Amino acid sequence: MVSSTTPSSGEYLLEMSGINKSFPGVKALDNVNLKVRPHSIHALMGENGAGKSTLLKCMFGIYQKDSGTILFQGKEIDFHSAKEALENGISMVHQELNLVLQRSVMDNMWLGRYPTKGMFVDQDKMYRETKAIFDELDIDIDPRARVGTLSVSQMQMIEIAKAFSYNAKIVIMDEPTSSLTEKEVNHLFTIIRKLKERGCGIVYISHKMEEIFQLCDEVTVLRDGQWIATEPLAGLTMDKIIAMMVGRSLNQRFPDKENKPGEVILEVRNLTSLRQPSIRDVSFDLHKGEILGIAGLVGAKRTDIVETLFGIREKSAGTITLHGKQINNHNANEAINHGFALVTEERRSTGIYAYLDIGFNSLISNIRNYKNKVGLLDNSRMKSDTQWVIDSMRVKTPGHRTQIGSLSGGNQQKVIIGRWLLTQPEILMLDEPTRGIDVGAKFEIYQLIAELAKKGKGIIIISSEMPELLGITDRILVMSNGLVSGIVDTKTTTQNEILRLASLHL
C-alpha cells in the first residue's frame, strides 16, 4: 500500500527510518535507518546475521515491520507482498536466482504478466520488448533460448533485465557476482551503472570489499541488528568499514603464513577426465603442508580437477600417485579411504543438510566408523566427535542439536570442514570455501586453513577471488579451457600474470 501522507524532502528515493522488527526471542532490527538517493549505488554491509536481509524483506513486503516508517518517492509505503513492491517500482535480484530453467528467456521475463493478443499470449510482442530491453542494457542473449542452457552469469543478466522491465526505481542486488568471472563482473557493473544513469537507486549487498570501492557511492553498515553508520565511500578505507562491521579492528585480512611445505605427497600426471568437455593432461605436485591455489575463468574446468581426484568424475587417462603409490579413486568412498576430502562449491545444495542438526552434518561423511561390534551406532562417541567439531572449528552455535540451516554461512562452512577432518584426510580440497561468507568469518576460515597446512595437510583451494588466492596460497595453478596454462609462485606472481595465463587457451 502506498500512502499519500508524509512527503519527503525529495533528496532520497527511499527513506527507511527507525525500523524495528522482532521474532520470538530475537530482536532482528533495532531502530535501523537506510536512505538511498536517485542516481546512486548504495552498499549495505554487515556480517551475516547483522540484519541486512531482514531490513530488505521489510522494504519488499515479505516481512511486516513492527514500527518505523518507509518513504518511497516521497510517500509512505507499507507493502504486504513482493508483488506489490514490484508493481510500485522496487525490485530485488536475489543471490539464489529465481528462474524457471525449462522455460525460455522471454517467458521468464514476463512470467505472470504476459502481453496478450485476444485470448492468446502475444509472442511477437514479448520477443520485441525483451529484445529492446536487452539492447538497451547491452545484453547479448537470445530471448527465445531456454534458460537452462545459459551460464550463471547470463541468468544474472536476465534477473537484472527483469527488474528493469518493471521500471524499477529501487533495485536491490544481493551478492550478484558470487558466481561470476572478472570479465562477467565488469559487464555486470556496466549494466548497474546504466541503471544508475537512468535515475535508479541501487542497494548493493556484497562481502567483496574491492567491488564496494569500485562501484558504490555510499555505504550503510549494520551490526547485530543496529544501524552503525552511513557515509560516502570516498572518505572511507577498507579497514574502517571492517571495523564498523565487526566492532573491532582487523589488523590483517589474511593470517601470517607459518606453514613450511615439505616433501611431495601427491603427484598428478596427464590427468584427463572422461566427460566432455574435459580437463586434459593436467599435471602438478602437492607438497605436505602446502596450500595450492587453482585459478581460472568460469568454464576453465577448475572444479573438474578436484572432482576427478575425488572420484566424482571418471578419468580417461593419467595417473594419481599418493606417497609414491599409484591409486585410482573410482568413487567418493575410495577417495575418502585414500585420505582425500572435498568441500564442494555449492554449500547450500551439496554441502549441508539444511533442515538437520549440526550433529548429523558433522558425522555424515564418517558415519560407518561409528558402528560398534554388534552393528549399533556408538552415540557417546558421535556426541563427542560433534562437540570436537564445534570446539575445534570454533562454531558459534547454541548446541549440537541446532539446525545447521539456521547458522551463518561461515559457521556452516566450519561444520563442513570439521566433518571432513573427522575422516583424517591427508589431502583437503576446498572449492570456493569463502563464497557468501562475511569478512570476519572469512578470516576465521583462512586461519583454519593455515593451521591445517601447518599440521602437514596438503590443501588445494579453488577460488574466484584473486586477493584470496594471493593472500593464503603458496603456489597457484592456473587453468584455461581445461588445460594447465601455468603454475606460479604466489610470492612473485601478480594478478595480471594470472589473468594472462587464464586467457591463454581461449
Curated annotation (Swiss-Prot):
Belongs to the ABC transporter superfamily. Galactose/methyl galactoside importer (TC 3.A.1.2.3) family. This is Galactose/methyl galactoside import ATP-binding protein MglA. Pfam families: ABC_tran. InterPro entries: AAA+_ATPase, ABC_carbohydrate_import_ATPase, ABC_transporter-like_ATP-bd, ABC_transporter-like_CS, P-loop_NTPase. GO terms for cellular component: plasma membrane. Part of the ABC transporter complex MglABC involved in galactose/methyl galactoside import. Responsible for energy coupling to the transport system. Keywords: ATP-binding, Cell inner membrane, Cell membrane, Membrane, Nucleotide-binding, Repeat, Sugar transport, Translocase, Transport. One of its GO terms (molecular function) is ATP hydrolysis activity. It is an enzyme of class 7 (translocase). Its EC number is 7.5.2.11. PANTHER family: CARBOHYDRATE TRANSPORT ATP-BINDING PROTEIN MG119-RELATED (PTHR43790), GALACTOSE_METHYL GALACTOSIDE IMPORT ATP-BINDING PROTEIN MGLA (PTHR43790:SF7). It is found in: Cell inner membrane. It is a peripheral membrane protein. The lineage of its organism: Bacteria, Pseudomonadati, Pseudomonadota, Gammaproteobacteria, Enterobacterales. Gene3D superfamilies: P-loop containing nucleotide triphosphate hydrolases (3.40.50.300). Transmembrane segments: none annotated. The keyword tRNA-binding does not apply. ATP binds at G46, E47, N48, G49, A50, G51, K52, S53. CDD domains: ABC_Carb_Monos_I, ABC_Carb_Monos_II. Residues 14-249, 264-506 form the ABC transporter domain. SUPFAM superfamilies: P-loop containing nucleoside triphosphate hydrolases. The complex is composed of one ATP-binding protein (MglA), two transmembrane proteins (MglC) and a solute-binding protein (MglB). It catalyses: D-galactose(out) + ATP + H2O = D-galactose(in) + ADP + phosphate + H(+); methyl beta-D-galactoside(out) + ATP + H2O = methyl beta-D-galactoside(in) + ADP + phosphate + H(+). It comes from the Bacteria. The gene is mglA.
